[in-house]
Structure formats: C-alpha cells, structure tokens
Amino acid sequence: MKLVEIAEDILSKANAYTNNTGLTSSQRFQLREEIRYQANGILSAIDGPEQTMKAIARSYTTCTALKVCVDLKLASHLPLSDARSLSQLAQICGCDSLVLRPMLRLLAKNGIFEQVDAETWQHTELSAVMAQPPFQALEEKYRSVAHLPRLLQAVSHQFPTPGRTAFNQVYCTSLDFYTYSNELDHAAARNFAFSMKELARNQIPFVQQSYPLETIDPESHFIDVAGGVGYLSFFLAGSFPKATFEVQDHPFIIEEAHSVCPSELRDRITFRAHNILHPQPEIAKEINGRLVFLVKIILHDHGDDDCRLMLRNLVSVMKQGDRILIIDTVIPETGGSLSSANSDIIIMSMFGSGHRTLEEFRALIHRCGEDLVIETFASGDEEYDGMMVIEVRKAEPVLDN
C-alpha cells in the first residue's frame, strides 16, 4: 500500500475510533491495533525496509537514554510547568552536561522531553510519566532483558529455567526477583509493590465487566494470594462491605501493607506473611464464609511446576462452594497486543516463564490432580490486553442412584 493510501486509511480508522459510533470494546481494541500497525507502516514506507530495520535494531539506544534519565531522576528535577537549561539540569542531576545532552536529544525524537531553544528543555506529556512509580520499577527489567541474548546463547537457545534466568545471572543470585528484592533489596521491593496500585485500579472495571461478582457470597472470606500491599482487596472491599480479606505476601511487603491500608478497612482486612509455594495456613475457626482465593497476575511469573504447587496448596483447603479466581493475561493463538508481546520477553528474562494460551491454562489446572471445574470470563478481554478471569471450583460430588 502506498504512503498516501496508508495515511488515508489511518485517517478513516482514526475518525471511527474517535467518534466511537456503535463500536464494541473488542472492535475498538482491534481498530486501535490496526492504526498502530499502519502508523508503523508509514515509517516503513518513508524510510524503506533496510533503514526501518536499522532503526528497530538501534532502538536499544533509546532504552539506554531512558534508563540513564531515570537513574538521574531527571523527570523529578524538571518542573512540570517550567523549563530549565541543560547546564541547570546537569548541575541538579550531578552529571556532565555532555552526557545529558545526547540523552535528551534522542528522547526528544520520540516525544520524550522537548527542546525549547538551543539551551532550554521542558517536559512533554510522555516525559511527565517518568516521575510516576511504575517507572521507578524498571531497573531489574531493563538489566535482565538486555542480558537475555547472552543467556540464550549460553544455553543453546533453550527456554530459561527458574533460578537460571537472565535476572539470576545479572544479579548473581539463585533467588527469584520477589525473594531477592524482599530479602536483599527493599527499595526494589517497595517500588514494585507500589507500582501495582494503578494496575489494580485499572483491573477493577475489567473484573466488574467480565465476572459475575453477584455470584459470590457477600460474606465471603477473600484471600489475596501474593497480593502485594493489598490494592485489589482494598478496591473489592467497597463492593463487598460484609466480606473479610486476608492479604498474603513476603514479610517486608506485609510490613509496608499495614501503612497503606485505609483506616476504614482495617477491621476487615488482615495481613499475613506467607510464601505461595508453602501450604496454605489453617483457616481461622471464626471464618464461616465461602473462601475466594484471588490469584492476580501471579501465574505468568512462574513455571508450570511452581504453578501446580501453588494451585494444589489452594485446592487442598477448599470446600464445595469455594473458588479460585485467576486474573491473568491469556494470549491468543494468533495476534495479541503489543503490550503482552513486550511483557512476554520481560517475563522470560526475569522469571524463566511466560504468558499462556487458554488451552495451556486449562492443561495446567487439570494437572493439579483434582476433579476441578473451570469457567472462563472475558467479555472485555481484548480491551484489557487479553485479560481473563478463570474460575476454578471443586466439582460437585456425583450421587449414586
């Protein structure tokens, strides 16, 4: 397709996307992906395939410039509503202006920071995002992904295994990221935990749209497995005013969780230090409601063996009527979002695991050695990056005639 034809097609789709006339969430997602794909097609049409491939191959330089500016906390040192000279920024950041200048020049080509004149720089909408918590949790991901090609060469391009990942080599440890950060790098653990707030907030509409929450006993006891500081439980507590919650995670994160729990929820939410690979603690005798185990964005960070162990630990304490709600990305057999494709590489680098298809999830759950019933809920899956809610229950006993 010629350049003008691509541009005209994008304009037509952009108008449909902006006007949102009668589009379902799935159609909006598909339209967005087509616009993004064709926008890249414009660059290819302008530069030609050889130059386009060179630009893609050199994109690691943009990541490097971004990482340097994150290390310097540049986004925080530059006021959102004002501009600063290069020399001022270099002095505030404690770096050489000759180091900072090429970083800013390259990022500005991507809309990250803006050069006002020969000496002065200011924020853009993109660069302002760098001051937010999720961007403070990129250190381990950046270093691990950068090391992945070398690791794969060393293992003859076989899939990495837990304990022998790019993260493990970079940080000279056999511990997984969560154990390592909670035991040895509390700043990393804290940054990661607090970066999950917006993710949890954005997932609540998806859960409400996709899963019939009204089928849950209003006096249920929710157990938020590896739940970080408890953001998902905080949000769900508003929908279940009679329910109780227990948030489980590593000891350091649980200490942090106490400080951020809303005061009005402290009589209904408890926190427990617990390793998800260990058997579930005994349920308190005063807990009479149905159990609902929340497993949100957990399984994709673990290999099949560990996932089966986690699920068996949950199933072993379940009774009829209890349920597990797995909230995770489920990749399609073809296609899928750019976001999930990116995170698949990150997960391989960090954990030696990856996203799963629905059939892979089903096989994983059924190999837990129990007679389990699986239902999937995904009415908004494409809009929410392929997310699904997978409900797991014990099968009803078959009565003899």
Curated annotation (Swiss-Prot):
Pfam families: Dimerisation (PF08100), Methyltransf_2 (PF00891). Keywords: Methyltransferase, S-adenosyl-L-methionine, Transferase. The keyword Transferase applies. Pathway: Mycotoxin biosynthesis. PROSITE patterns: SAM_OMT_II. GO terms for biological process: methylation; secondary metabolite biosynthetic process. Its EC number is 2.1.1.-. The keyword Cell wall biogenesis/degradation does not apply. S-adenosyl-L-methionine binds at D249. Belongs to the class I-like SAM-binding methyltransferase superfamily. Cation-independent O-methyltransferase family. This is O-methyltransferase SAT18. It comes from Stachybotrys chartarum (strain CBS 109288 / IBT 7711). The gene is SAT18.
